[in-house]
C-alpha cells in the first residue's frame, strides 16, 4: 500500500489578529490551510479568537522589538515553513489637525502604524526566503494616497509603509519574497471607535468593507502562483463618496 504524503505545514502570522480585519484575515488563512499565529495586546480577545478559529495566540505589542523576537522564537520552534506575514495591527491614535496632536501622539502613531510593521518585515523576510518564498501583506490605508484634514500623521505612516514595501520587494524579488500593500477604506471594524471618530450609521457599516471580505482578498493574494504578485491594491466600498479618486 502506497504511503500517504505528509501534509506540508505552512506557517503564517497575523498581527492584530483578534479583532476587525485581523479576525477576518485569520479565518481566511486558517481555512486556506495555514497554521496561523495571531498577536495583539488584548489577551482575552486573542484567546477567544484563537479558540474559535483554530489559531494560536501570543500576547505581544508590535511596537516592542523584544516582543517581535519572542513571537518569532515561538513560531520557529513549530514544524513547517514560515510563508506569510500579515501586518494588520494599526490605530488612529489621535485624529486631529497636526498642531493639535502632541509629540507623544505622533510618536505613538508612527510606532504602531509604521515602525511595528517594519520590525515585522525585517524578521519575516529572511524566514520567508529560507522557506523558498512567500508573501508579506501590509494592511495600509487609502490615507496613504488620499488627503483628509486631521489624518496627517496616520497618512504619513501608511505612505511610508507602502514605499518601504516596494523597496523590500526589490531587495528580495529574486529570492521569492512578495510584498503587497493592501489599502482599504471604510470598514466594519472597531477602528473608528478606537480613533474616537463619529460612529457609522448601521446602513453604512453594513455596506462597508467586511472583515471576511478583506480576509478572502488576503488569502487570494497569498495563493497566487509564485511567479505573480500584487504590488498594491486599493479597496473602496462604493457607498463612500470620494472626490477626486
Label each PLM-derived region with a short phrase:
Residues 18-20:
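Conserved glycine-rich cofactor-binding loop
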Residues 121, 157:
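Active-site helix of classical SDR
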Amino acid at each position: 500500500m502506497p504511503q500517504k504524503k505528509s501534509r506540508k505545514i505552512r506557517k503564517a502570522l497575523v498581527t492584530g489578529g483578534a479583532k476587525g480585519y485581523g479576525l477576518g484575515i485569520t479565518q481566511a488563512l486558517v481555512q486556506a490551510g495555514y497554521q496561523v499565529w495571531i498577536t495583539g495586546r488584548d489577551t482575552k480577545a486573542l484567546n477567544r479568537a484563537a479558540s474559535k478559529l483554530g489559531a494560536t495566540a501570543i500576547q505581544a505589542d508590535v511596537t516592542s522589538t523584544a516582543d517581535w523576537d519572542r513571537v518569532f522564537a515561538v513560531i520557529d520552534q513549530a514544524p513547517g515553513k514560515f510563508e506569510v506575514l500579515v501586518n494588520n495591527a494599526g490605530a488612529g491614535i489621535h485624529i486631529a489637525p497636526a498642531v493639535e496632536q502632541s509629540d507623544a501622539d505622533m510618536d505613538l502613531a508612527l510606532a504602531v502604524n509604521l515602525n511595528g510593521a517594519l520590525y515585522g518585515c525585517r524578521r519575516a523576510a529572511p524566514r520567508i526566503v529560507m522557506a523558498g518564498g512567500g508573501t508579506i501583506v501590509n494592511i495600509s490605508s487609502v490615507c496613504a494616497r488620499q488627503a483628509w484634514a486631521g489624518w496627517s500623521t496616520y497618512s504619513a505612516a501608511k505612505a511610508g509603509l507602502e514605499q518601504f514595501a516596494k523597496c523590500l520587494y526589490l531587495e528580495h524579488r529574486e529570492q521569492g519574497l512578495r510584498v503587497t500593500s493592501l489599502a482599504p477604506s471604510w470598514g466594519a471594524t472597531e477602528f473608528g471607535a478606537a480613533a474616537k471618530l463619529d460612529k457609522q450609521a448601521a446602513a453604512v457599516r453594513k455596506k462597508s468593507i467586511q472583515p471576511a471580505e478583506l480576509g478572502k482578498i488576503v488569502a487570494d493574494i497569498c495563493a497566487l502562483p509564485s511567479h505573480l504578485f500584487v504590488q498594491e491594491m486599493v479597496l473602496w466600498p462604493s457607498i463612500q463618496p470620494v472626490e477626486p479618486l
